[in-house]
From Swiss-Prot:
PANTHER family: CHITINASE, V CHITINASE, PUTATIVE (AFU_ORTHOLOGUE AFUA_6G13720)-RELATED. GO terms for molecular function: chitin binding. It is found in: Membrane. GO terms for cellular component: membrane. Residues 498-543, 562-610 form the LysM domain. This is Non-secreted LysM effector LysM17. The LysM (lysin motif) domains are small globular domains involved in binding chitin in eukaryotes. LysM1 contains one LysM domain. Keywords: Chitin-binding, Glycoprotein, Membrane, Repeat, Transmembrane, Transmembrane helix, Virulence. The lineage of its organism: Eukaryota, Fungi, Dikarya, Ascomycota, Pezizomycotina. Signal peptide: none annotated.
Length: 769
C-alpha cells in the first residue's frame, strides 16, 4: 500500500463487526490524547501487527500509520459475546495463530499491560473475546476503544493483535495478567507511563524470604492461609493461553509436528481441549500404561477445503530408489471389523478420515514413514504408511475410499481396520485403524504391528476380494540380472559401499531387490554369514562392492554431543542399529540430557545424544511458558543449570512440561529412573524451579490495603451492579501490596481481578468491575 492517493469511496460497514477503523486514518483523531497513549504503549509492536492483516500496509508503522483493522464491538454490550471478531477491509478473518512468513507461534499483545496508562481508570478493563481469542479494552464508563471519542465523535485506534513470545532469563510478565487492572500497584507509580518498566521496577524491589512461623504484619496462621490458597487450585487457570486452551490449529501449525503443542498425558490433553485433534507421539512409548509419561504433540484438527490441496506431481519419483527399477504393483486392501455397528459415530469417523487425508496430502512430498492419530472423545483413528509408499498418495486414496464406504453404509463398527500388510517388508505396509470406544492403546498396538510388517487382527473379517485395491510403485526384482551395475550412484568414497537401511519385515531377498542387485551379489557384498538371520531395523547393509562406512556419530568441535531429534517411529534399538551403537551406550550418553526418560519410554520431538559430549539445548515446546524449552530461548553455555532459564513469574513453580503453577502438580520435585534433568517419577509432573509450596513473604509493608476480587468464570463481563452470582472471596486484610499482586496473578486468566484501594469502604459488598 502506498501513500494516501486522496479521497476515495469508503466500503460499506459490515454489520455485526463493530466499527471500522479507516484504512487511511482519515477518520481517526491523531490528536486524541488516548490515541497518543496507545501509540506510546505499543508503537514498537505495530510492525508485527500488520503481518496478520490481509492486504499488508505501509512499511513505516510509526504514529499515524495505516492499520487495516475492523474492531470488535464492546465486549458483551453492543454485540453478543460469542460473535465479536476481527476482520480486514475485505471482511476476511485476519487473526491467526502463526506468523504467515516465519511460521513462528505468536501470542496476543498484552493489552492489560500495554494500555496501563489508560486502564489505570478503575472502569477500564481488558476483556477476553472468546471468538477470536483476543482482547477488547473497555474505556471509561460508556464506550470502548473500539468505538469513538465521546468528545468529538472521531474514531480511536484499537490494536487487537499479536506479537511473538518475548522471553527473559529471570523475570517475565505473564500473559495471565492481561485481565487485571492493577490499581493498587499503579496507584503508587502514577508518574510511570510505561507499564512494563513499572512492573519490573516494582518486582525487582521486592525482597522475599520464606518463613515458617508468624511475622509482624502477617496472618498468624500461615499454614491455614497456605492450605486455603492451595485448596482453591487457582493454578488450573494460570497461564490460560498456554495450558487451558486447545492446541494450535493444524492449518496454521503446518505438517512439522515440532510446531504442535505438547501435553504430558491423555488426561492432561482431555482437560485442555474437547475439540478434534491430530496427535503425534513415540510409537514405542505405550500411551495407555497407567502413570506413564508420554510427550503428546497435538494440533486442533481444522483443515477446510482440503479437496483443493494439490500434492506434488513428482513426489513418487523423488522418493523412489534411484538404482532399483520401479514397477507398478496392484495390491488388495484387507477390510476388517469387530463389534456392533451404529450410526452414532459416522460423522465423527468420516471427519477424522478427512482430516487425516488433508494431512496426508499436505505431507505427500516427504519421503518418510507416516504415523499419525486423530482423537475426539471416544473416536480414535490411527494411520501408518511405510516409507516406500511416501509421495505416492496411497494413504490419501485409502482414507478417501474408507470414508466413502462408511458414508454409504451409514454405520460404523466399534473397530475397523484397513490394511495392506501381506508384503514381506514394512516399507510397503499400510493400515488405517478406527476405534469408537476410546481404546487408544489398541490403535497404537495396531500401528506397531504395521510398522513390524505384520497384520492387526480383529474378530470378524470381510474378505479382501470384497473390497478395494490400490496401485503404487515399488522396486522390481524381475528386471534385475547378474549384469546389473551396483555402482549407479556415487559412493561415499572409493572404498565405501553404497548402503540402504533395513526396515521391519525385510529379508536379504527384499533388500537385494531394493538395492537393484541379485541375491548372489547381495551375499557377496555382505559377507557376514549371520546377517540374514539377524536383520535389525535401522541397520545399514551394502548394495555395492566396498567397505561398510562407519556410521558412529562424533561430537562437534565445540564439545557438544551429536544430537538427534527423536521421531515418532524411532526406538533405541533402531537408533543404535543405524548409528553403530548399543542401547547401553545411548543410555550412557544421555545421563544429563534434558527430558531423557530412558530407552523404554523415549519422547518424540526431544533431542538426545548419540555420542559423548555436552548435552544439547532441548528442543522447544511451542506452548511452554517456563524452563529451557520456551520458544526463542538463547543457547546456554555448557554445564548451565537449564532449570534456571525462564523462571515463572512471581516465583511460581515450573514443571517438566514448561507450565507454571502453585499446586503439587507443579511444585513437587520427583526423580525418574534415569535421574536426568527435566524428568519426573511416573504419574508426576515434577518441578524444575521454585519448587515447594511454602508461603513466600516479604518484610512488613509500610501500608496495607483491603481488597476483594470476583470470579466471573466464563460469563460475559460487566453485569449490572448487585447481580453477581459469583464467589466474593476475601483476601486477608493485612496482606502486603506485593502479596496481593502475587495472588491476583495466581488466580489466573479466566478470573477478572480488580484490586481496589480501600480507604475504609465496606468490602463486604461486591465491587462493580
Amino acid at each position: 500500500m502506498g501513500p494516501n492517493p486522496g479521497p476515495k469511496a469508503q466500503p460499506a460497514p459490515i454489520r455485526g463487526f463493530g466499527v471500522k477503523i479507516d484504512q487511511y486514518t482519515n477518520d481517526v483523531d491523531l490528536k486524541d490524547e488516548a490515541n497518543v497513549k496507545l501509540w506510546e504503549a505499543i508503537g514498537d509492536h505495530i510492525s508485527l501487527v500488520t503481518k496478520f492483516l490481509a492486504g499488508g500496509g505501509p512499511t513505516d508503522y510509526g504514529a499515524g500509520g495505516k492499520p487495516l483493522l475492523f474492531c470488535g464491538a464492546e465486549a458483551g454490550v453492543h454485540q453478543p459475546w460469542d460473535t465479536s471478531i476481527v476482520k480486514d477491509h475485505e471482511g476476511k478473518n485476519v487473526v491467526t495463530d502463526r506468523d504467515p512468513k516465519t511460521k513462528m507461534p505468536t501470542k496476543y499483545l498484552n493489552l492489560g499491560l500495554a494500555f496501563m496508562g489508560v486502564s489505570r481508570n478503575p472502569n477500564a478493563n481488558a476483556f477476553w473475546m472468546s471468538k477470536f481469542d483476543g482482547y477488547d479494552l473497555d474505556y471509561d464508563d460508556d464506550t470502548s476503544l473500539c468505538a469513538e471519542n465521546p468528545k468529538d465523535g472521531r474514531l480511536r485506534y484499537a490494536k487487537v493483535a499479536k506479537r511473538p513470545f518475548i522471553r527473559y532469563t529471570k523475570m517475565r510478565l505473564p500473559p495471565l495478567a492481561t485481565a487485571i487492572p492493577l490499581a493498587v500497584v499503579w496507584a503508587s507509580l502514577a508518574s510511570v507511563i510505561n507499564a512494563n518498566k513499572a512492573a519490573n521496577a516494582l518486582l525487582a524491589s521486592i525482597s522475599v524470604s520464606t518463613v515458617s512461623g508468624t511475622a509482624p504484619g502477617r496472618p498468624t496462621e500461615l499454614v491455614s492461609a497456605q492450605e486455603a490458597i492451595l485448596a482453591g487450585d487457582y493454578t488450573k487457570r494460570l497461564h490460560y493461553q498456554g495450558r487451558d486452551v486447545c492446541p494450535v490449529g493444524c492449518s496454521n501449525a503446518g505438517i512439522d509436528t515440532s510446531s504442535w503443542f505438547v501435553y504430558g498425558s491423555l488426561n492432561r490433553l482431555d482437560r485442555a481441549c474437547d475439540r478434534p485433534m491430530l496427535l503425534d507421539f513415540a510409537l514405542a512409548n505405550p500411551i495407555d500404561t497407567q502413570k506413564s509419561h508420554v510427550a503428546i504433540s497435538a494440533c486442533t484438527a481444522d483443515y477446510e477445503n482440503f479437496s483443493s490441496f494439490v500434492p506434488s506431481s513428482d513426489s513418487a519419483t523423488s522418493c523412489a530408489s534411484k538404482v532399483a527399477e520401479q514397477a507398478e504393483v496392484t495390491f488388495p486392501l484387507l477390510l476388517k471389523s469387530s463389534g456392533a455397528s451404529s450410526s452414532q459415530h459416522v460423522a465423527d469417523v468420516t471427519s477424522a478420515l478427512e482430516q487425516l487425508q488433508a494431512f496426508a496430502i499436505l505431507s505427500n512430498s516427504g519421503c518418510n514413514e507416516t504415523i499419525k492419530y486423530f482423537y475426539s472423545g471416544d473416536v480414535i483413528v490411527g494411520v501408518y504408511a511405510g516409507s516406500g509408499l511416501a509421495g505416492q498418495g496411497v494413504l490419501s486414496t485409502v482414507l478417501e475410499k474408507l470414508s466413502t464406504r462408511i458414508k454409504d453404509d451409514g454405520s460404523v463398527a466399534e473397530s475397523w481396520s484397513v490394511e495392506m500388510c501381506s508384503n514381506s517388508s514394512a516399507r510397503y505396509s499400510l493400515s488405517v485403524l478406527v476405534n469408537t470406544k476410546g481404546k487408544f492403546g489398541a490403535v497404537q498396538r495396531g500401528l506397531q504391528a504395521s510398522k513390524n510388517g505384520t497384520c492387526f487382527s480383529t474378530e470378524t473379517e470381510i474378505a479382501a476380494s470384497d473390497w478395494e485395491t490400490v496401485t503404487y510403485l515399488a522396486a522390481s526384482a524381475s528386471s534385475i540380472t547378474s549384469t546389473a551395475n551396483p555402482n549407479k550412484l556415487t559412493s561415499y568414497r572409493a572404498t565405501a559401499c553404497r548402503t540402504i537401511q533395513v526396515v521391519s519385515g525385510d529379508s536379504c531377498a527384499s533388500l537385494a531387490t531394493q538395492c537393484g542387485i541379485t541375491a548372489a551379489q547381495f551375499t557377496k557384498y555382505n559377507s557376514d554369514p549371520s546377517l540374514c538371520s539377524g536383520l535389525t531395523p535401522g541397520k545399514h547393509v551394502c548394495c555395492s562392492p566396498g567397505t561398510l562406512p562407519d556410521f558412529t556419530p562424533k561430537p562437534s568441535a565445540d564439545g557438544y554431543c551429536y544430537s538427534n531429534l527423536v521421531k515418532s517411529g524411532d526406538s533405541c534399538a533402531s537408533l543404535a542399529a543405524a548409528n553403530d551403537l548399543t542401547n547401553a551406550k545411548i543410555e550412557s550418553f544421555n545421563k544429563m540430557t534434558w527430558g531423557w526418560n530412558g530407552c523404554e519410554k523415549p519422547f518424540a520431538k526431544y533431542k538426545i545424544c548419540l555420542s559423548t559430549g555436552y548435552p544439547p539445548m532441548p528442543a522447544t515446546i511451542p506452548n511452554a511458558v517456563c524452563g529451557p524449552q520456551v520458544n526463542d530461548t538463547v543457547k546456554a553455555p555448557p554445564e548451565t543449570d537449564l532449570s534456571t532459564l525462564n523462571e515463572c513469574p512471581l516465583n511460581a513453580c515450573c514443571n517438566i512440561w514448561g507450565q507454571c503453577g502453585t499446586t503439587g502438580d507443579f511444585c513437587t520435585p520427583s526423580n525418574s529412573s534415569t535421574g536426568a534433568p527435566g524428568t519426573a517419577a511416573p504419574g508426576k509432573n515434577g518441578c524444575i524451579s521454585n519448587c515447594g509450596t511454602n508461603i513466600v513473604t516479604s518484610s512488613a509493608p509500610g501500608k496495607t490495603y483491603n481488597v476483594s476480587y470476583h470470579d466471573l468464570g466464563g460469563r460475559p463481563p460487566r453485569p449490572p451492579f448487585g447481580e453477581y452470582n459469583s464467589k466474593d472471596s476475601r483476601i486477608p486484610a493485612n496482606f502486603s501490596c506485593e502479596r496481593v499482586v502475587q495472588l491476583a496473578m495466581e488466580m489466573g486468566h479466566s478470573t477478572i481481578v480488580q484490586l481496589l484501594i480501600d480507604a475504609g469502604a465496606d468490602t463486604s459488598l461486591p465491587h462493580p468491575l
